[in-house]
Amino acid sequence: MSVSLSKGGNVSLSKAAPSMKNVLVGLGWDARSTDGQDFDLDASAFLLASNGKVRGDSDFIFYNNLTSSDGSVTHTGDNRTGEGDGDDESLKIKLDAVPSEVDKIIFVVTIHDAQARRQSFGQVSGAFIRLVNDDNQTEVARYDLTEDASTETAMLFGELYRHNGEWKFRAVGQGYAGGLASVCAQYGINAS
């Protein structure tokens, strides 16, 4: 049975799914209103060391870098419309392959060309992040984002992190007004 999380809530993967080795992180959303322009949201992952920064550019997984250099995290591809039910974009994580110096993997969704298109998360509804045991396709945890993020153009949906030798997942729901560039700058990537 899937654990439904509220903002800030967390779940121990070793308790919720003790045998899980491979995680599918599914992210979804719907464009509430548009002016006819494309509304392209992009999921990405950042593999963070204990200092809260990436170890290098290869720890930023997104549509132009689909797999981490160690193969532990893979982006399954860019969905440019967000149309339809279910996951709009997803990432796969091999928990046993994540390097020991990676303490946390954060999952961020950004709006492509948000400033030029005058788009924000205020025009997005039904946003969610879910963790699925990729070995048996059982949903382990889900967080439905409900906050009004009227000016934000990037959103940290959730994070996988190590705590006392086990993996946990936390629902975050933190918005950023500066889009992908501000998220990259915070975690040690030069996005220019």
Swiss-Prot record:
Gene3D superfamilies named among the record's database cross-references: sav2460 like domains
Disulphide bond pairs: none
Pfam families linked: TerD
Taxonomy, superkingdom: Bacteria
InterPro entries: Stress/Tellurium_Resist (IPR051324), TerD (IPR003325)
CDD domains: TerD_like
GO biological process, one term: response to tellurium ion
Keyword list, A-Z: Plasmid, Tellurium resistance
Function: Not known; seems to contribute to the tellurium resistance (Ter) mechanism. Also involved in phage inhibition (Phi) and colicin resistance (PacB).
Family designation: Belongs to the CAPAB/TerDEXZ family.
Designated name of the protein: Tellurium resistance protein TerD
Organism annotation: Serratia marcescens
Gene: terD
